Amino acid sequence: MGSPAAVVAGWGAAPAKRARREGSPEGPRGPTAESDRCDPRLWDTERLCQHLSCCGVGEPSLLRRFRESGVTGSMLLDLPACALEVTRVCLPAERLKVLACLNKLRQQHVDVMKVFNDPIHGHIEIHPLLVRIIDTPQFQRLRYIKQLGGTYFVFPGASHNRFEHSIGVGYLAGCLVRALKERQPELDITQRDILCVEIAGLCHDLGHGPFSHMFDGRFIPLTRPDLKWKHETASVEMFEHLIASNKLEEVMKSYGLVLEEDMNFIKEQIGGPIDETACEKSWPYRGRQKEKSFLYEIVANKRNGIDVDKWDYFARDCHHLGIQNNFDYKRLLKFTRVCEVKNQKHLCTRDKEVGNLYDMFHTRNCLHRRAYQHKIGNIIEIMITEAFQKADKFFKIEGSGGKLYQISTAMEDMEAYTKLTDNIYLEILHSSCPELKEARDILHKIERRQLYKFLGETQPETMRQIVKNNSLAESIANSKPEKDPPDVELKAEDFIIDVINMDYGMKEQNPIDKVLFYCKADPSKAVKISKEQVSKLLPMTFAEQVIRVYCKSQDPDTISAAKQYFIQWCIEKDFTKPQDGDVVAPHLTPMKKSWNNMRDDEHRTAAEPSCKQRLPFDK
């Protein structure tokens, strides 16, 4: 019998208006009586026996054995377990008929899956339990948090949000784990495993704050410098709050999940081991045993950074930024398998894909240089951070029990944090509260494009690490040039210093050194491939620092003076020469010898005669 057409649900519509078929879960209170009747996964033993009778396999002795065994509809999710139970309960002559009946029932109910039309992955099927999670205030909150934060102020197409990215990651997580199940049945990947991995992918970004990484990367370190907080921690807390406040525990059980064990597994995929001291143990996780260690490398791969989260944001961000994406995750899906190394199972990639993986990390680096760390996008985020910092004491958010929280403390209460989105930008901008005037003025400058002026960027010439702190602005204010000094006196508060760490995802390490490969000759054996085995044209270093300096003033004379301060500061600190150094401060750059030494190849080129002079027949 052919399967009924699935529902196509658009993301643009409000979740309450999404088209639903009869039998799909309705509302936040759990399955209705109608969905109990139509969705076989929610059937109890008696309802299952009634269906067997309708199929013509309702002999009293068979039904009695089914009732005694306690088989329920949730077992239909896991075909191997279902077949095992049928083999145990049924007589040999009955087994084929019963299995055929139950399998047909499974096939008839693919309409329970919802279909979303995603601009990146096309028409994708989403499990009804994931739809129940999506249709909650905690998940819908992600519609109002920009994926790329302040980058949207520079790239007009980068208007996408954490909402669609999270759905994409949930989908890709399911694609990868299903591909592994089909390719390697011996891994014993169950339907429970698949569902938990999909939920972890879907919920991995629930904890992001306003403007995504601006909140945890700039605002929180500035307002609460002693707090060691990560958005992954908030994602775990928000996931717990989502399940509890929407009473989804019973729904999870109805789809075959074992609540405590699978909740732990989902949270561990998002935030790592629940017990931090457990990291010292040989196996720190509670949700799954060591035999399924590879499942922890799908959503957030702590070992080498190759995970479905990156696969989605590479494709999605490039699409919206208008930047070419040279990495195709679909090819990697076909060449990923599991191998055992030192008593643990890890995701491995075919050896011939090593070049594509270098391309993947190169794509990541290019995205950071061209978009994520754009000099204008960054200064806009710095200005928004300043505005939020000035508004922090006066902006109140109501949490559980009526308690009020600030912007910087809202993540302590998930009810308050649910209300904290990019919308606070507009609330401050359009407020009439006198206490918010300073914050409002900064946001008005952003709206009028009266941004802090970019003076230039530089890098440390040696391998030393520059730590971002207030002393950097003080040192640049003390670097007034002695040769032809400008008339303007500048102070530390006139400067903004932004220190950016660029890398391939693992600081100074080569992430490919952490990747395991397999060869065609023996797909079960994992090997490593060194950089030297791939190409001599690959990067020699995998991390660098970029130091950008801005001036808060809009006055042309002040900006001109600030650029000279900046050049003098680079000379004193032994940093590289800014690209426009010879233009903005031609009287200063000759003072540093290393800035004016041409390389040997430049000397040779200057010394060689031109082609016209060398050719004897050209007279």
Predicted features by range, described:
Residues 100, 186-189, 478, 533:
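Charge-dense, low-complexity polyampholytic segments
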Residues 2-21, 25, 32, 371, ...:
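Terminal helices and disordered tails flanking the catalytic cores of nucleotide-processing hydrolases
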Residues 2-38, 67, 103-199, 207-458, ...:
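Sequence-structural signature of the catalytic-core scaffold of metal-dependent phosphohydrolases
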Residues 27-58, 63-64, 73-112:
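Sterile Alpha Motif
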Residues 73-75, 84-86, 94, 321, ...:
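Eukaryotic short linear interaction motifs
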